Amino acid sequence: EGVTVPVIAEFGPYFDEVSVETPSIEVPGTWLGQMIIDQILPHGYAFAQVSVMGTGRSNHCMDLMGNAEQLGVDAAVTWLGTQEWSNGGVSMIGKSYDGSTPWQAATFGNEYLKTIVPISGLIGVMELMWKNGSSEARAPIMHNGVYGSYGIDGDQEDIGNMCPDYIIGPGTG
């Protein structure tokens, strides 16, 4: 009680999978989760895996690397940095898609985000995925086949997990 710790966070679409369970936490074991549990937590860090919108245990429509997703990542960094158990220092780590979200977060200049460790992440996601405020054709074609599958699982929430721009954007952008 009264102890504060720095936070390491990983943001991405991959966290609706079989989990590793320890006595006090449940974390997806593949990706970086198991390594963080084994190598980082024993040194006094908190660890958060945050599902981007429309994936895992999150809600809202999946806004693949779009403005809403970026604002959500920034809001989550602020939330992590202001918890009573947090010392106010949040770092982000990730590879692949999760390596792009640290770059997204860094663009906001969030006072709680102290460092990023992007591994194989995209820089300039907005330029790649969006054109004139709408998703470009390659956004859903290139990435929804992979990333969209994390938000679409055949249940009634699927319609809510698809942003309207993904339906009309490629045809108009």
Could you tell me what each predicted segment is?
Residues 2-81:
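Cap/lid segment of the alpha/beta-hydrolase catalytic domain
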Residues 58, 96-97, 120:
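Catalytic nucleophile serine of serine hydrolases
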